[in-house]
Amino acid sequence: MSSTAHNSQPSTGNGVTKRKSGSAACIHCHRRKVRCDARIVGLPCSNCRSAGKADCRIHEKKKRLAVRSILDPVPIRCRPPPDSDSTPKLLPSTPIQPNAFTTAFRGVQPDVTSPVAAGAQIIQSPHSSYTNGNHLSNNRGSQPITETQTFTRQPGADRSMELENNADLEKRLVKLIDEEESGSREIQRGVRAIYVGHELSNMSFLIRQQRDKDDDVYHFAGNEIPRRQLRTGHDQLLMDALTLPEPALADELVEAYFMHVNPGYPIIEEDLFMTQYRNRDPADPPPILLLQAILLVGAHVTRPKAERDALKEIFFRRVKWLFDSRIERNRDIMVQAALLMTWHSDSADDDVAANAHYWVGVAARIATGLGMHRNPVSSKFVPRDRRMWRRLWYILVQFDVMVSLSYGRPQAINLEDSDVSPLTPSDFEGCGSRVQAEYVIHFSELCTMIPYIVRERFGLRVSAERRKAALQEADEALANWSLKLPDSLRLRASDMDPWSAMLHLTYNNFLILLHRPHPRASAYSDDYGPHDAEICSAAAGVIASIFEELRLNDRLKFLWYSGVHTLFTAMIQVRVELRFSNPVLAINALRRFDSASYSLRELAEYWSHANTILRLFQDSKRLQEDLRMATSERPRRFSTHDQNKNTTNPSNPHPTPTPNLNSNTTIQSAQTEPRPPYEVPTPESPRMPPTTMSPHQNQPFDSWIPSSHLASVDPIDQPREFLDWRQLFSFTDPDQSVLPVPMEGLPELEDEWRQIYWQETPMSDLLQDGGWMHG
């Protein structure tokens, strides 16, 4: 027996070593898994005495090494509170060291803390008083992080690999298009299947132009599924998920959410939540799942990019863990949290199960499982919950429609199964004084109308006759909706608020999707409307103008996820107009494309999928040529056939004249001034001064649409052929004069416009050189 054993254990007078109470079995009894009485009789135990074993000693459990955390450290650290006298003030050059106020998450380390985000104070407030088990404990996270709790990792190794993977993923469309066999490549195990969407999808639209033989192919083999290791354990995730920022940062983010997001998407009853949040009552705290989700959205609309990305990643990780772990048992709150999580998108790695499309589907499943799609007529239903359900249902419908239009995927909700009564102003009681009730009501009407139009116009089993009639009915319904908008929601020449902007962006995006030519035009040769070119051009102009106004006023950050895809739709239309033989229209398209490009660059600061669209246009060689052609002095011709038709056709009472470029000062300036080689702005490009679509800084949105007096138009009840397409566009001031130049000559170019869309395949070069997988 070792001397250590003798020294560590007291001995009785008869030479039998006594163990302290609570000791475990000896090594032999432990191995044989029999009861050992060493704790009572001492060593050797009775079993060892009987067996004649002299080496009886207590079995010592192997010391478990501390679990090495390889979780990315939270790159944010708190400075000491102002009233702390014990903490010395640090000079700017002094590195911040962990202290009692550092975040509760185990894994913070000074040497890898990002200096950019050092000012963001993600910590557990030591003053929090939440003690509910499902919420926050006041002593959780206020403990100092000691040396034994801090672990090391290879700094930057995982991040470098992640950046390389993301760069490859952004160019995965190049592989899909350039590889001739990609359409027939087997989707094997470990490879992602890419669904390009139905006929309405931008992605499907471009694929059909490029591949005539793949008309019936909607699934393609994508990149290999990346393998990621589990970065943390459950104990650390729990501690992290229950961690809140210090009060100052939390207050700022909560206030930002209720000021900039909840008024237009009243997911949460502001009065009730803020009462819980301000009272800090342990008996009635705000749900931790909801609070973390609000902090996520608040960070999106307030913080600068580097800090915003770090904060959103942290908050999203916490919200998702709480959501998946079913910490919150109230399913209403789970619907609310899922809708709020649509404000965060993971990297380009996944556009199916890690973005708004996924979370809208999750919210829809829970909501329909709860029965939110049915009208709660029971008198026993709590009025507050009845109002909340109705609001949540229609916001869910809005998100579902917008994300479905963005990707060309089926909706998660079938409105044929719903009988929820329309929203009324009384449904917004308790949502705060800033709630935009009129916006939510009219936007819900639009999003309720769109699914029926899509089904009748683009349904797989719809006859050609019904498809043609659906276009007429859709225009009438949309025009009636537009004419009934209140003045507060009509298009304005300036000071466009995010709510009316989102409404008109969605509306004009749908107009383009509804009226642009189908790539397989032979199958739909007789179902075009008589003014499709004007409608698409006007809608694209409105979209570009709205984005410019929001960009100049720093309001792009308030747009929801679908705003990126709306701008993508408009840029496809403007891309076609760049190739018009009419130089006036081509110059106008150049201005709009320039403005839209800068708006897309700004959107890429907030939404990762905007980067891939930006690269799609940036890498196009034919696009650069078209941009140069749009500014050249020589008239461009689409084809000899079209030029002869436009100049010699006797049935055309207004042949398209060849404009004198010198007669227009704007065009003359664009041609005579030296222009540098055009480059679509990218995230890596140097910052440029904001550009506008004309020399006039405050050009009205409606300057791209011929003037009309919309207020005096009666509701539409006449046949389609008598419908004035201008009724599809409503403005605040019906007497406002509108510059008609952009539309001059466009009706005569209707056939050319269609040919550019689906015969010349103007977007095929973008697919060959770009890199985007979203529909």
Swiss-Prot record:
Induction: By omega amino acids.
Signal peptide interval: none
Keywords, ordered alphabetically: Activator, DNA-binding, Metal-binding, Nucleus, Transcription, Transcription regulation, Zinc
GO cellular component terms attached to this protein's record: nucleus
UniProt biased composition (Polar residues): 1-15, 126-153
Subcellular location: Nucleus
Ranges of the DNA-binding region feature: 26-59
InterPro entries: Amide_Lactam_Regulators (IPR052073), Transcription_factor_dom_fun (IPR007219), Zn2-C6_fun-type_DNA-bd_sf (IPR036864), Zn2Cys6_DnaBD (IPR001138)
Biased composition (Basic and acidic residues): 630-644
Gene Ontology MF, one: DNA binding
Single Gene Ontology BP annotation: DNA-templated transcription
Location of the region described as Disordered in the Swiss-Prot/TrEMBL record: 1-20, 126-159, 630-699
Source organism, top-level taxon: Eukaryota
Bias (Pro residues) ranges: 674-689
Pfam families, per the entry: Fungal_trans (PF04082), Zn_clus (PF00172)
Function of the molecule: Positively regulates the expression of genes involved in the catabolism of certain amides, omega amino acids, and lactams.
PANTHER family per record: ACETAMIDASE REGULATORY PROTEIN (PTHR47171:SF4), FARA-RELATED (PTHR47171)
Listed name of the protein: Acetamidase regulatory protein
Source species: Aspergillus oryzae (strain ATCC 42149 / RIB 40)
Gene that encodes it: amdR
